[in-house]
């Protein structure tokens, strides 16, 4: 994994697959939902929020404004769309989606944990 060139998309893909096959892991972004889509015991989650909530959160945490947020979101969308052929933000690409402007981050974490645990149990019961 460490022998890869920084920024190499093939390295990122291979690293995500190796780590996922090694054991439990959490990946944020980098098209991990797409890369791991054929792994049965993988749970992909999409976290989203309404624009006003995101704008306030970005300002609170990073001191950034909506213009910077919009640019960063466009970059993420372009990256995801280019490497997957799917549309970034389409909740149909995921097992589970949570609107984090409607629940606390702690509640979201609990929902994810319970969903993943139930999914694993259902896979074992088959």
Named regions from a protein language model:
Residues 34-39, 91:
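Short loop/helix-cap segments at secondary-structure boundaries that form the rim of catalytic
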Residues 1-7, 11-12:
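Single conserved hydrophobic/aromatic residue that forms the stacking wall/gate
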Residues 13, 105-113:
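Short, amphipathic alpha-helical "lid/cap" segments that border enzyme active or binding sites
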Residues 119-126:
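C-terminal helical "lid" subdomain and adjoining coupling/linker elements of P-loop NTPases
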Residues 22-25:
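Loop/turn-to-beta-strand initiation segments
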Residues 29-33:
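Short, polar loop motifs at secondary-structure junctions
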Residues 64-106:
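Small-molecule kinase domains that catalyze NTP-dependent phosphoryl transfer to phosphate-bearing small molecules
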Residues 38-62, 66-72:
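Conserved phosphate-donor/acceptor-positioning beta-strand/loop module used by diverse small-molecule
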């Amino acid at each position: 994994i460490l022998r890869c060139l920084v920024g190499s998309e093939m390295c990122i893909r291979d690293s995500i697959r190796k780590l996922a096959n090694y054991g439990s892991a959490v990946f944020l972004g980098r098209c991990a939902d797409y890369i791991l889509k054929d792994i049965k015991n993988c749970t992909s989650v999409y976290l989203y929020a309404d624009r006003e909530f995101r704008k306030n959160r970005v300002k609170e945490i990073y001191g950034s404004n909506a213009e910077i947020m919009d640019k960063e979101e466009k970059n993420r969308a372009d990256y995801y769309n280019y490497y997957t052929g799917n549309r970034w933000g389409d909740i149909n690409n995921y097992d589970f989606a949570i609107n984090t402007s409607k629940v606390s981050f702690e509640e979201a974490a609990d929902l994810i944990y319970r969903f993943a645990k139930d999914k694993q149990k259902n896979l074992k019961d088959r």
